[in-house]
Amino acid sequence: MIRFESPRRWLPTLTASVVLLAGCASQNIEQYAAERPQLDLAHYFNGKVIAHGIFQDRSGQVVRRFTVDMDGRWYGNQGVLDEHFTYSDGKKERRIWRLTKHADGRYTGTADDVVGTASGRAVGNAFQWAYTLNLPVDGKVYEVQFDDWMYLIDERVMLNRASMSKFGIRLGEVTLSFQKHTP
């Protein structure tokens, strides 16, 4: 004979599990389909763009400030985005993205410090981009995952929030404000 326990015993555990799992759910890019202006990454990153950003550790403390001077060039569905980072401590870095625009708003990209291929998709005014980055820290290099979300505010301004994690543990967050140079 099968014996069922009273819901009073297992319902609180089930409810807590559902709440915890819901907290792990991420945004869905499709929810931005009706948002305007429409983001065409190849158009936005064609030419000069400057960004100002911060990195916050998992407690929320700002531990790094930086600017990024970018120059993008597109030839058909192939693009190059040349990024020059300047940090508040004077350190400088450079990353060159080689990007490909695919059908349905999908993009892929590679860079020397990116492991494998980054992939993302633009829908409405939003773009979601995921990749693994080789991050140098105190003489060691760590592979960390980035979940990047960009939101086009108007033709010139775009905001970016990126969550950085390792082994699924959130390490911090990057926030950027992009401003497209218009002649």
Residue ranges with predicted function:
Residues 2-14:
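Bacterial N-terminal signal peptides that target proteins for export
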Residues 21-23:
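C-terminal motif of bacterial Sec signal peptides marking the signal peptidase cleavage site
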Residues 25-28:
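Bacterial signal peptide processing site
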Residues 30, 68, 74, 148, ...:
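Sequence-level preference for short, compositionally simple segments enriched
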Residues 32-48:
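N-terminal helix-cap/turn-to-beta initiation motif at the start of protein domains
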Residues 52, 56-137:
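Central antiparallel beta-sheet cores of small beta-barrel/beta-sandwich binding domains
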Residues 62-68, 141-146, 170-174:
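Amphipathic hydrophobic-ligand
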Residues 147-183:
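Glycine-rich, aromatic-bearing surface loops/beta-hairpins
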